[in-house]
Amino acid sequence: MMSDDLTLVREFATRQSEPAFTTLVERHIGLVHSAALRQTGDAHLAEEITQAVFIILARKAATLGPRTILSAWLYRTTRYAAADALRQQRRRAAREQEATCNPL
């Protein structure tokens, strides 16, 4: 019997059920990875974002409400995580550029 997403989230949140979390990851990894890849255009960065999003899910599972649509929550979280990653990448590139232009 396939459980719905929120049942699996509750199972993970209350019992730290690894099988429940694994099922959630298997169901949604394609959505999360493709959204991250579409936003960043970088396969390696998309993999990092995908891992980060599922870590966020693990940490916040207990806070998700009964009306949460998990796929929408994951997509939104992926978009935010990708935007943050791209900002960090731009800041790092700017610092490196500044260090190159202004040697000590």
Task: Please place each PLM-identified region on the residue numbering.
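N-terminal module of bacterial RNA polymerase sigma factors
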Residues: M1-G30, Q97
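Short, basic/polar amphipathic helix motif occurring as a linker/hinge flanking DNA-binding modules
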Residues: M1-M2, E47, T63-G65, S71, ...
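Conserved acidic
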Residues: L8, Q16-L24, L45, I49, ...
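Sigma70-family region 2
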Residues: A13-T14, R38-A43, Q51-I69, Q88-A94
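Amphipathic, Lys/Arg- and hydrophobic-enriched alpha-helical face
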Residues: E18, T23-A43, K60, Y75-T78
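Short amphipathic alpha-helical surface patches that mediate protein-protein
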Residues: E26-I29, Q51-F54, T100
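Conserved adenine-binding aromatic site and its adjacent loop/helix in ATP-hydrolyzing domains
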Residues: I55, R76, Q97-C101
